């Protein structure tokens, strides 16, 4: 089984909205919140969300290096084959958090990781040339199931170290 860890913010984890943006990094066993939908698609491909790491947007961005270090520390015990950062949809601050964490995991820790967010997220332009970002709809937009399927497919491919196809084939934002 492919071991997946997902990174979510307080909203996607179901812990509250903007009033909970100060939540510090914490782990959860298995899938939570938005991850419950994604887990179904991953399981069809021989993968499962073994853990979720959560951090509030405000806390992450105000303490970026500390948050990245703590989240990395929390991810290690799950022995992840791949880390999915998001989906952030069009939550601007969360998109940036996803980009920073995916970049650190890939470059510093050599853990396969990628992000998922809508084109409207500020994280998309900041990170599209630095990490793979699977395109998702914005909140309330159509196509969430299709994007979750692309996320699951990409996670499996990334975990196996398989060659990554074009942005059109894989569903990530084109890199310059």
Where are the predicted features?
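An N-terminal assembly and electron-transfer interface module characteristic of large anaerobic redox
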Residues: 1-176
